[in-house]
A protein has these predicted regions:
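Short, membrane-interfacial amphipathic segments enriched in basic
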Residues: 2-48
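Membrane-interface helix starts
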Residues: 39-48, 53-65, 228-231
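Active-site cofactor/substrate anionic-group-binding motifs, chiefly glycine-
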Residues: 55-107
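Selective transmembrane-helix segments that form parts of the transport pathway or gating/packing helices
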Residues: 56, 60, 64, 139-163, ...
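Membrane-interfacial helix-loop-helix connectors in multipass membrane proteins
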Residues: 77-100, 148, 157-202, 211-225, ...
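Hydrophobic alpha-helical transmembrane segments of multi-pass membrane transport proteins
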Residues: 92-128
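Short cytoplasmic-facing helical segments at TM-TM junctions of multi-pass membrane proteins
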Residues: 122-144
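Juxtamembrane boundary at the C-terminal end of a transmembrane helix
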Residues: 239-251
Length: 251
């Protein structure tokens, strides 16, 4: 019985290692094609615009509502915690760091993953079923690019909406006027925050698309998407926090 258990663990470990290795090869192939100028043509551009409409423009009303609700609640919690620790003067820095660097990319990619991961998986399954893997340039690459661009755009939109809706929390909790709130937020905002937002959202978006496409092409169940996506996202989030701490320590 013990030997059977050990064999199962070994088989599972080898299977996971092979799966992640093949996914890395698939990722490398996609990156090489994205960087190849020959990939881009009129047909590919048409598919890209269609995918962008489906993954970003079409869902903006729902996303704005979610961002406004979460913005008021989350920033309210940040302000309450700041008040408890007498950090009112650093409210702007806390809001900018928490919203732009951490919360906006994560919530945006979770929204994209929840709405479109299964759809991407089904599309890839149909491509596999129809034997149309050769249409990498016109189907797979546009889907990856559209997911990346949509995640970046929604992250920026989410940050703006959260910061604007967060003023309500600041006003009711601290009684802060709009001019002071704008000064604290904009004085805390810098190029590094925008850079981190764009890098994180682009990485997160590419992970969602590549994992869903890979599982679809290999006819894996959609539930495999979520587990792989969450593991990779939280690893990147932890790594980014570590890099930020090291960077701040060096400065």
């Amino acid at each position: 019985m013990l030997s059977t258990f050990i064999n199962r663990i070994g088989e599972r470990t080898v299977s996971l290692a092979i799966s992640y290795y093949e996914m890395m090869l698939f990722t490398s192939l996609c990156i090489l094609n994205i960087l190849n100028p020959r990939t881009y043509n009129s047909e590919m551009a048409t598919h890209l615009m269609t995918q962008l409409y489906q993954t970003s423009i079409k869902v903006i009303p729902h996303f704005i509502l979610i961002a406004a609700i979460f913005g008021s609640v989350v920033i309210g919690l940040v302000i309450v915690i700041a008040s408890d620790f007498s950090l009112q003067i650093q409210v702007g820095s806390l809001i900018v760091t928490f919203v732009i660097n951490e919360f906006a990319p994560l919530l945006s990619v979770f929204f994209i993953a929840y709405r479109f991961s299964a759809l991407i998986h089904r599309e890839a399954s149909f491509i596999h079923f129809d034997g149309e893997i050769q249409l990498l340039h016109n189907l797979i690459i546009p889907r990856i690019l559209s997911t990346v661009l949509s995640t970046m755009a929604l992250s920026i939109l989410f940050s703006m909406i959260m910061i604007m809706s967060g003023y309500l929390s600041v006003f009711f909790i601290l009684g802060m006027d709009l001019h002071t709130y704008k000064y604290l937020v904009f004085s805390s905002l810098n190029v590094q925050n925008i850079f981190i937002l764009l890098i994180k959202s682009s990485l997160f978006g590419s992970i969602v698309a590549i994992v869903a496409l890979y599982n679809g092409l290999h006819v894996l169940k959609p539930k495999h998407n979520a587990s792989k996506i969450f593991v990779i996202l939280f690893f990147i989030e932890f790594l980014s926090l570590f890099i930020q701490k090291v960077f701040n320590a060096i400065q």
